[in-house]
């Protein structure tokens, strides 16, 4: 990973921890606000909203695929741990609070940034990657049921961005079956 301001010698010295303030709002905040606007008949309408959501789902799938490609699993993938960072020229914050930018525009132009890697791990196990996707799928379904059907776009984009996705997605089917069995049996 290239880090602005660090030369090659500094990066290879080891022991570095880099933190950054991520401008923007969580995907959860943007999706909840957008769904509320559609329900109230505000904004550009349901069809445009769903198109924007599909675009966001594609960005999420690509980001997760890139993370898995480098051997990292998140451990707690939810829409609360996905930030939408606006382009630099669009950044306007309100005292560290939510960005004062239209949610629809955020969906179209925002960059996905994964946050909160407290439960993350480095792994080469397809099972771990599949569990990551399963957690995101379950979290998405419970938090955003009104647009749950758009989640397939995450899987499509994941499949395009991660070369090992076919095996992971097959493993995801097994993980889902175990999850259903577990919830059925208590």
Stretches found by the model and what they are:
Residues 1-56:
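Conserved structural core of kinase catalytic domains
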Residues 23, 79, 119:
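Short, glycine/acidic-enriched loop or turn micro-motifs at the edges of active sites
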Residues 26, 91, 122-124:
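Conserved protein kinase catalytic core
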Residues 63-67:
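Conserved hydrophobic alpha-helix
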Residues 69-79, 84:
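Catalytic-loop of the protein kinase fold
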Residues 81-114:
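Conserved protein kinase catalytic/activation segment
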Residues 102-186:
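C-lobe/activation-segment region of protein kinase-like
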